[in-house]
Curated annotation (Swiss-Prot):
PANTHER family: ASPARTATE CARBAMOYLTRANSFERASE, ORNITHINE CARBAMOYLTRANSFERASE, MITOCHONDRIAL. Disulfide bonds: none annotated. This is Aspartate carbamoyltransferase catalytic subunit. InterPro entries: Asp/Orn_carbamoyltranf_P-bd, Asp/Orn_carbamoylTrfase, Asp/Orn_carbamoylTrfase_sf, Asp_carbamoyltransf, Asp_carbamoyltransf_Asp/Orn-bd. Belongs to the aspartate/ornithine carbamoyltransferase superfamily. ATCase family. L-aspartate binds at residues 83, 171, 225. It comes from Mycolicibacterium vanbaalenii (strain DSM 7251 / JCM 13017 / BCRC 16820 / KCTC 9966 / NRRL B-24157 / PYR-1). Heterododecamer (2C3:3R2) of six catalytic PyrB chains organized as two trimers (C3), and six regulatory PyrI chains organized as three dimers (R2). The gene is pyrB. Catalyzes the condensation of carbamoyl phosphate and aspartate to form carbamoyl aspartate and inorganic phosphate, the committed step in the de novo pyrimidine nucleotide biosynthesis pathway. The lineage of its organism: Bacteria, Bacillati, Actinomycetota, Actinomycetes, Mycobacteriales. Carbamoyl phosphate binds at residues 55-56, 105, 138, 141, 266-267. It is an enzyme of class 2 (transferase). It comes from the Bacteria.
Length: 315
């Protein structure tokens, strides 16, 4: 496997190998005073973030550094992009500089695929990892969500995962639908009709507008942020109305099964799509997701740069 561009790129075997290795990396680092493994020593990883990010950017940087790779950050404000350089020319420059992997977040859907095409050469070019492209995909987020579900519930297969909120603008939702389906979960989307994408009827999901009917049946609930920055019209009457209809309040949380887990990709709009008390409750796995993000991204880098057949952990 050369690139990770979409969650659909992952076979069940690939996804399971990445999740298993993420757990191995987590276990290998427990108790280490210096969190360093030699796995990617001598490799160069470059992050290219053209959109704001905290969790994804930091976790990729930490993942690379914990594996002893050289991690270099390129941003639009601090590079020749600010002078008008195209994404293609930037990518070719970084390939020529000897990057082993390019990790890109970009506002344009399809940017990661373009990067893979532009950087292909007779040696194969660097591995490309999609860290979020527009409203299209965010495959490593789906992997860390799946890992969190597996850790909390024992497995992903056969579990009912309810995804609530702004599905229309959510790359997280698209990647989760694809990966959860691959891993054998049942996926339910709960959203107002205005926040569902065209063609959702062809997705391997059940669609509902009734959050109260779905919560008691859920093994996991993934709450999505309303992405106001991607909206240029009225998708719902008001923030208050949205919260009343689709927010995960403390009262709604009481309808969840005792074993059910609450997920959120962040950043959270507390008080809108999720109540303060719910976000901080024992059923919430939000901080576990962040921790898993580092280990999953370590496993993805290992999978692409070393190979799934190699030993993931060495002292």
């Amino acid at each position: 496997m050369k690139h990770l561009l979409t969650a659909a790129d992952l076979s069940r075997e690939d996804a399971t190998a990445i999740l298993d290795n993420a757990d191995r990396f987590r276990e290998a680092l427990v108790g280490r005073e210096v969190k360093k493994l030699p796995t990617l020593r001598g490799r160069t990883i470059i992050t290219m973030f053209y959109e704001n990010s905290t969790r994804t950017r930091v976790s990729f940087e930490v993942a690379g550094k914990w594996m002893s790779a050289d991690v270099i950050n390129v941003s639009s404000s601090g590079s020749s992009v600010a002078k008008g350089e195209s994404l293609r020319d930037t990518a070719l420059t970084l390939r020529a500089a000897g990057a082993d992997a390019l990790i890109i977040r970009h506002p344009a859907s399809g940017a990661a695929q373009q990067l893979a095409a532009w950087t292909l050469d007779e040696h194969g070019g660097p591995s490309i990892i999609n860290a979020g492209d527009g409203t299209h995909e965010h495959p490593t987020q789906a992997l860390l969500d799946a890992l969190t579900i597996r850790q909390r519930l024992g497995s992903v297969e056969g579990k009912r995962v309810v995804i609530v909120g702004d599905v229309l603008h959510s790359r997280v939702a698209r990647s989760n639908v694809a990966l959860l389906h691959t891993l054998g979960a049942e996926v339910v989307l709960v959203a107002p009709p205005t926040l569902l994408p065209v063609g959702v009827a062809d997705w391997p999901v059940t669609v509902s507008q009734d959050i109260d009917a779905e919560l008691p049946l859920a093994d996991a609930v993934l709450m999505l942020r309303v992405q106001a920055e991607r909206m240029n019209g009225g998708f719902f009457p008001s923030s208050r109305e949205y919260s009343v209809r689709y927010g995960l309040s403390e009262k709604r949380q009481s309808r969840l099964a005792e074993h059910a887990v609450v997920l959120h990709p962040g950043p959270m709009l507390r008080g809108m799509e999720i109540a303060y008390s719910v976000a901080d409750s024992s059923q919430s796995a939000v901080l576990q997701q962040v921790s898993n993000g580092v280990h999953v991204r370590m496993a993805v880098l290992f999978h692409l740069l070393v190979g799934s057949e190699q030993e993931a952990i060495s002292a």
